[in-house]
């Protein structure tokens, strides 16, 4: 996958177990430069500082964040995503949504700028995700989802926040134990459950989410 490729770029200068990067036993100081031609809007790794490494032997799946993960350039052409099937597209939409959704609920000193960006992005993803469910070759919808993928996970919607990404961490545990579960599938299952458990911790924020 794209994030595994990024992990290999970090691992290029290290002779040990690549999983040492994800467990922070080894801290990368440099990586091979990479350019991206985006063919599936989902993980946001085309602009993010994140990568994820899985180990089926260890039954572990962990992320690793460093600016060394960021590509030097990205080419985004919505037509390149026309062939992505409905299920994979849907999983991508959920992942994009969750990247901002989780940042939205992270603690902050009432950072309205980040929240307004997040609300606009989530509305955009929901609207265009519905459009793609009816027509996978809707160019405008593909373009909106593609740019949302990039901006949902590049840090903008988390400005001024203590980023924890709890749902992603839970999903990593889920799909590490059962790799047949697609990342977006796991997130789609966990998001409603997380909301049901945590809404009482910040009811005002949940009301804002529902209204906006």
Walk through the language-model features, giving the residues of each:
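Short glycine-rich or small-residue beta-strand-to-loop segments that form or flank ligand, phosphate
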Residues: 1, 35, 152-153
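N-terminal small/polar loop signature for handling phosphorylated ligands or for N-terminal nucleophile
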Residues: 1-20, 131-142
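Short glycine/serine/threonine-rich phosphate/pyrophosphate-binding segments
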Residues: 1-9, 44-47, 163, 167-168
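Active-site-proximal flexible loops/turns
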Residues: 5, 9, 45, 84, ...
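A glycine/threonine-rich phosphate-anchoring loop and its flanking beta-alpha core
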Residues: 11-113
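Active-site segments that bind and position negatively charged phosphate/pyrophosphate groups
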Residues: 103, 107-212
């Amino acid at each position: 996958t794209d994030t595994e490729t990024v992990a290999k770029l970090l691992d290029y200068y290290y002779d040990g177990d690549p999983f040492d990067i994800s467990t922070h036993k080894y801290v990368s100081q440099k990586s091979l430069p990479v350019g991206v031609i985006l063919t599936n809007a989902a993980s946001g790794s085309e602009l993010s500082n994140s990568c994820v490494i899985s180990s089926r032997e260890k039954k572990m799946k962990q992320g690793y964040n460093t600016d060394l993960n960021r590509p030097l350039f990205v080419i985004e052409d919505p037509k390149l995503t026309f062939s992505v099937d409905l299920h994979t597209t849907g999983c991508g939409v959920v992942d994009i949504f969750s990247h901002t959704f989780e940042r939205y609920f992270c603690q902050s000193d009432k950072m309205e700028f980040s929240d307004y960006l997040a609300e606009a992005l989530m509305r955009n993803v929901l609207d265009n995700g519905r459009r793609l469910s009816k027509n996978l070759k809707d160019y405008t919808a593909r373009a909106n989802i593609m740019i949302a993928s990039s901006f949902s996970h590049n840090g903008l919607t988390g400005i001024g926040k203590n980023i924890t990404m709890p749902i992603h961490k839970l999903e990593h545990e889920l799909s590490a134990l059962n790799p047949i579960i697609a990342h977006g599938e796991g997130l789609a299952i966990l998001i409603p459950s997380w909301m049901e458990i945590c809404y009482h911790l910040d009811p005002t924020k949940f009301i804002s989410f529902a209204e906006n």
